[in-house]
């Protein structure tokens, strides 16, 4: 199973309609679009998927739709993390029911939980996942939970944990984790340092911008596999030019707007309180969509 979890995994966006409801048809198109561009797998219901502005029922619905569209074609990882252990367990059970390959959970956040409470939280989710491997999700910039290296080492050695999504710019820590855990599946989480993350020991990555240019990240993997560091650097630079624009527009709404211009997502809106993209960026995003479509073809 560990080998199946390696690779380039798109952190799937969740499309909504003008009434802020789940757009299931756009979601299905987005899943197919990711499969067509050669993604190894999907990370469903995470930060990029706006999970924390959805109800548990909506998150279950997203898992079900994605499984219907992609099960057996690519690797599927369900992010089931919530502040509540019970809510996370409910989603983990759903992931098992729908045939996902693994579950993942962000560290419980908002309240100042003790580290032992974090460990108990993961143990309970792993139990509810009924044999599915766990991907621990470390994202200190958003969760506010700043794990020490020793704490990370403890979490990734809990029974049932197979992987770590390391969304941190600390490449030294990435290398330390790899050195300490040679068999752990280790994902780079920040797209802008994907190539550097691989060189620091990551097996692959989970990222939001893979939704619109996954083939570039696959190209970086292939270039490094062949020892062509210069090519990997060039591809990373091209990815980062896109990321520069998305940071200006707001990453999730910018991605949805690009996918709208690619005829994948019907409505380029995130759920409130996220606002729409500022209209001044629309020409640049439209040009980017056209460029990427031509490149993909």
Curated annotation (Swiss-Prot):
InterPro entries: Aldolase_TIM, DapA-like, NanA, Schiff_base-form_aldolases_AS, Schiff_base-form_aldolases_CS. It is found in: Cytoplasm. Aceneuramate binds at residues 47-48, 167, 189, 191-192, 208. Keywords: Carbohydrate metabolism, Cytoplasm, Lyase, Schiff base. Homotetramer. This is N-acetylneuraminate lyase. The gene is nanA. Belongs to the DapA family. NanA subfamily. GO terms for cellular component: cytosol. It catalyses: aceneuramate = aldehydo-N-acetyl-D-mannosamine + pyruvate.
